């Protein structure tokens, strides 16, 4: 993605979207939307192309799988502590785990990669269904907050915050943060999100967990 001449990035309610254009595909445009799968570990992509020639070809691959056993990844991948992580990119000599070609033509296509019970990355066959299921789950989560102000940015930011609070839920407790500092801190302010967004059963579950551990 980083090699395209024009890159527009958008984030809203737990999903990313990129609009890409390049001199090598004059008049062509590629839009990629990525969101988490509704269950398990994985990602679902919707790839839409327009203005491409019949001879244009779109290929993909997943590579660079790394296993970190017994390590806390939210600390290892903390860019404030390890700024060199910002220079990471694609390395051509990395092993391709899975890959393929997409159908030629200006159509919307779907791709889903999930980790199976052994941690192996596999390509799912029912990609469109998986994508729509993941999208519906995000809409349900973020739809817990109804907001309508004159500021569209505030509206988008507020609804996105619901997904962030959901990301701090590590049953049976809320953790400090979704990525960095995602450690369980009793009484930390992330529990306020569970209260404000109506996850009262989660708040009660956390309370019971800590109260039961009191001596």
Give the location of each predicted region.
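An extended acidic
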Residues: 1-20, 100, 104, 127-146, ...
């Amino acid at each position: 993605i980083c090699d395209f001449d024009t890159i527009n990035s958008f984030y809203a309610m737990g999903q990313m979207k990129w609009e890409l254009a390049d001199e090598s595909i004059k008049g062509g445009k590629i839009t990629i939307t990525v969101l988490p799968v509704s269950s398990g570990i994985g990602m679902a992509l919707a790839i839409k192309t327009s203005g491409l020639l019949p001879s244009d070809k779109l290929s993909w691959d997943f590579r660079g799988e790394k296993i970190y056993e017994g390590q806390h990844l939210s600390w290892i991948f903390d860019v404030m502590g390890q700024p060199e992580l910002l220079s990471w990119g694609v390395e051509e000599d990395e092993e391709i785990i899975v890959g393929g070609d997409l159908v030629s033509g200006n159509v919307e296509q779907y791709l889903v990669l999930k980790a199976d019970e052994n941690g192996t990355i596999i390509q799912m066959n029912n990609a469109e269904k998986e994508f729509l299921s993941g999208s519906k789950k995000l809409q349900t989560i973020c739809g817990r907050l109804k907001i309508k102000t004159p500021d569209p940015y505030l509206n988008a930011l507020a609804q996105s915050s619901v997904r962030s609070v959901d990301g701090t839920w590590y049953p049976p407790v809320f953790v400090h943060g979704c990525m960095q500092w995602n450690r369980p801190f009793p009484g930390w302010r992330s529990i306020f999100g569970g209260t404000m967004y109506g996850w009262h059963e989660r708040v009660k579950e956390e309370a019971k967990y800590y109260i039961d551990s009191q001596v």
